[in-house]
Structures are given as C-alpha cells and as structure tokens.
Amino acid sequence: YHSGYEDKFLRIMEEYKLTSGIVVKGEEGTSHFSLRLGKPSDTERKAINYAQGFRPKDQEKTPFAQDVDPAAFGYTYDQNPRLPEITSQSFAEAGLAALSGQQGPVYDRLILNTALTDHLLGLEPDPDTALQHAQEAIESGRALNRLQTYIAATNQK
C-alpha cells in the first residue's frame, strides 16, 4: 500500500466486522514481507515489512503495529533475492518448486509470509509455532495439494 492508506484499509475491515485484519507495507508495492528489513520505521516513514492491524484476544480486538525483521526468524539475506527472469512463468515455476520443498529464497519467502501473517492475525500463538506449521504444510505436500485442488476446481467448465 502507499503510506496513508493503512488506516483506511483497516477501517474498512472493521466496518465489515472482520475479527482480524492486517495491512503490510511490502516489497515493491506488494503486501508481501521482504526477506530483508532495511531501515526500520521511524516517525517520518514506515519501513518495508511494516505490519499494522488487529486480532482477537479475550473477546476483543487487539491492535498491533510493528516492523517484521526476517533476521529475527533466521532469514539473513544481504540483498533481497530476485529471480533471474522476471516473468509470470518464472514466478509460477519458482512457487511450485518451493511448494514442492525446494529450498531457497522463494521457499523462505513463502514460509516467512505465511507464518507471520498467521501469527499476526491471531491464528497461531507465536511466531516460532507459526514457522513450524508453515514449514510442515510445505514439507508434507499439503500446501501444494491445496493449490493443485484449487487450480483443478477453477479449471472445470
């Protein structure tokens, strides 16, 4: 998102009575956490990997706002990795390879994003458990199976 929209997005989520919601200032305008934090947030600007939202706790919505530092979870990259070829085909192939268990930056990105999103939304009690569950979903083949089931269902005429 662009700065200034986070509160608007969160307000819309609350108006729709969602029990949890998150906005992420992701890399290159996406809603995905980068594998590097870069400069932390300050009073003037929000960092890449800044997450803000709310989650349920004790029957109430609890707000949160924080930078997500991948290094705190064991992901240490000097530069944010990029695929050699930037095409939809290369992204799809890399994603399928990662969901098949191929280790590397795309795999790390999937684990980090899935786990931290689940944790921040209150679906997992802590980041370490969330990371473990995300990794188990890929290593067991459950994540790839879900994607393949979705693709098959959407291709039916």
Model-identified regions with their sequence ranges:
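Glycine-rich anion-binding loops and their surrounding alpha/beta cores
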Residues: 1-157
